[in-house]
Every structure is written in C-alpha cells, then in structure tokens.
Amino acid sequence: MTAVSQSSGQEQRPEEVCVEFCDVEKSFGGEQKILDGINLRLPAGTTTAVVGESGSGKTTLLQLVNAVLRPDAGEVRVFGQPIPQDDLVSFRRGIGYAVQGAGLFPHLSNRENVELLAKLAGWSASRREARYLQLLAMMGLDEEVSDRYPHTISGGQQQRVGLCRAFMLQPRLLLLDEPFSAVDPITRIGIYQTFSEVKAREGVSSLLVTHDMREAARLADYLVILARGRVLQEGTVGDIIAAPADDYVQMLVKEQL
C-alpha cells in the first residue's frame, strides 16, 4: 500500500492510515504560511519521506504530529484519531522521535539516555534492562558503550544510541528529523541498513523528513516533495523519476538520484 493524497479518491480504512493531514495550515506571527493546505494520508507499516529544502515546512509537519505545535486550520489525525487536547504524555508514548545529531543528553550515560523515557513511564528496572539489551543488540552496539557518555563514542555510535532511545517504548509511529545527516556517508550506509532491519522487525510506521533525495529513496516506500509549504508531488521513487511534476522536482531528481 502507498500513501495517497485525499484528492485521489482511494478508499482506506482508518486503521490503515498512521497519519492524516486534512487541509492543514500553519504560520508564525502572521507571516507567510509555513504550511498551506496540506492533505496527506500516510499508510501504516511503511516509511514516508518528506523531502524539501530548509524552510519548506517539513520539520513543522513533524511538530504537528507530535503536538509540539497545533495547526492554525485543519486537522491532524494519528491512527485515525484526532490529536488530544490533553493527556499528551500518554499520546507521545506511542511516538518515537529521532533527530539530527542524535540529541542525547550529555550529562547522562548512553544507557540512561535510552532508558530515560521508559523510567518516566513507570517501567520496572528489569523490563527496562531487557528492552535496552534487546535494542543494543539489534543496533549492533556493544555493551561497553552503556556506561560511557555520548561525547566519548563516535558519531555513528551516538546515532545508533539515539535510535535505541526512539524505539525504546515500542512506539507505533517513528518521527525522523534528518537523523542521519551528522554522520559520514560510509557510516550512514551501515546505519540505514540497521534502521531498516529494526524498523521491519518492530513493525513501526515512520515519517522521515530530509533534504537528501538519495536518503529518501534509500529508506522510504513513498515520497512527498514539499516546497514553500505546499505539496508539489507525491509518489513512489519510480513515479517521481519517470514524471517529475515541475522544474524543482526535476532538479532534485537530476542532482541527487
């Protein structure tokens, strides 16, 4: 199944859609709209990549899904339900978040970084330990990184620790904000492979935002091209290569694929 825009007319049961944007608009300070009339339906169990330059609105999309921001107009639904107005703590436990540069707390050990949200969620020490060791193994990390601090391990290891944290609470949905851009290209390829394997094993739906078309093509089942707060084109990689919607999309294809 692929993601479809609302205008396509394709019927999907609510439980098949992990995130839905319905006529969503967002602006800051009354200035130009950051998001302008976004309509998207993203299928559960897949990875959708939103590709765009800085300022295109792609990070704002993630912040709306995670309820860090609220839309000025329209609605965002997660697994068929409107984002709640209260009890956001429980809502966010179903969402994992991975960011550029891993976003680890420097004063916590790598283990403490990964286990923090589970501890706050009331998980027992034994449950946290079992899940932590499971993720460490899946991410290809040695236990010796556990009691070290983020600055004492490589950038690639930090990124893997950050992904462990994102997967810790067994989320249904994973939000990825350019999480691999801070590591070198060779290391990145290995992390791509590991991420894809763990995501498939965990059965997680994911929404990736990136400026890198090659990264999107490597990781995603479906692409959304965003510019100036509007969706320019959506489709599979093959669809977009075969028929770019405009000059900007054609430039992305020629320069990055």
Predicted features by range, described:
Residues 66:
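Helix-to-loop junction immediately C-terminal to a conserved catalytic motif
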Residues 170:
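Conserved catalytic motifs of ABC-family nucleotide-binding domains
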Residues 149-153, 157:
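Conserved ABC ATPase signature
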Residues 126-144, 196-197:
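Conserved ABC ATPase "signature" region
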Residues 234-235:
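ABC ATPase "signature
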Residues 74-82, 91:
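Conserved ABC transporter NBD signature motif
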